[in-house]
Amino acid sequence: MKILSLLVVGALCMGGKVYGEVNGDWNNNGDWNNNGDWNNNGDWNNNGPILDCSTLQCPPRYHCEVNNGNRQCVEDQITLPPFDKCDNVHCPKGFNCKYDWEKDLALCVPWRPYPPVCRTRCPEGHECKVDEWGKECCVKIKCDDICDLRCPKGHECKIKHDGSKCCVRSWRPRPHKPHPRPPICRLRCPPGHECKHDEHGKECCVKKRHHDRCDLKCKRGYECKIKHDGSKCCVKRTPKRPCCKPNSCARDEKCVATKDRIICVKPTCDNTRCPPNYHCICGDKIDGVKCVPDCKKARCDDVECPDFHRCVERRGGILSCEFDPPRQPRSLDWAENENDDRDYDDRDYDDDEYDGDYDGRDGDYDGDYDGDYDDDNYYGDDDYDNDWDNDNDWGNDWDNDWDNEDGDNWNDDDFQDANDEWDY
């Protein structure tokens, strides 16, 4: 690969402009891969696409050549036309010599619509002439060609093609305007016509020509252009930027248009852009690259966890089912004792005064009894040894039990007798 790059760089440094395109490389086994390769038996394996000049578009003034399986854009060898053919051709008055590129002939063609105006300032005794190629030059005035008419200010004497003399508006350059423009034609013309000055400076209406041919011969790198006023000039040629066509590259190649040429590259996910919500994939089982839709992001609404578990979304979008212990249902409120007129529903937990002890029944179980609440729903007390079990049974010395069938009542005679003696 490095040797081939040095050859291309060397060709450019020596003046030969070659735009090469390398479609292969050396693999790890030392074989050359050019969308096909030499196998170990020495045979050519052409499994890849055939690369020829039909799929490569070269810039202007370049043509495609295939050398050693590589396509190259080589500069055209421009053959200059035989301009000397018109040197020995003398055309009659009103005609000039033109070189026909297609027929390779020097032809005498008439001026269309009139000979160009010569604006070159010539020394005394010389006049400006236009040769057969439209080039302005100063030639010595002959004695019989002297225009001796006295013309008014702003006009000058001119000799017509028939030899007659007349005074026409002067277009002679001035010192402050060495290249003055011709006077503006102000004549109103009918549709399809335009105002022009003839060779004598007279205004007239001529029919518009939509397909004027620009026949000026320009130097290399320049081309003929027709201005808005109908005049012709040579301007620098701007190379057109090549464009990719359906057959510019092989089937599995991607066409990239640069400033002066097109390049065929193998598409990869690095140089492939996919639309939104799509991503690029490539591999051995895929022909080239492919854009496939992105996977839908999972949410906890789409996850079903087992019992006593709930879905939690962690950092990075990771979903997990974590244990969620069930909450113990709230105990039934104590009902009012039928033998006591005090309200037992008006109880509270006073953490500040009793340090987290259960303070129900307007101050029951305070610090004097050193009662505590443990995990087994047990109220331990040294003196009274009262406990609260899960069967909603209140066990103490009086064997008070809760009878749900009698309508939320305390049915115990001993408790009723001792209820008034309880120190709240």
From Swiss-Prot:
Residues 52-74, 85-109, 117-139, 184-206, 215-234, 299-322 form the Follistatin-like domain. It comes from the Eukaryota. Keywords: Repeat, Signal, Sporulation. One of its GO terms (biological process) is sporulation resulting in formation of a cellular spore. Residues 335-357, 365-424 have a biased composition (Acidic residues). GO terms for cellular component: glycoprotein complex; plasma membrane; spore wall. Residues 330-424 are annotated as: Disordered. This is Spore coat protein SP60. The gene is cotC.
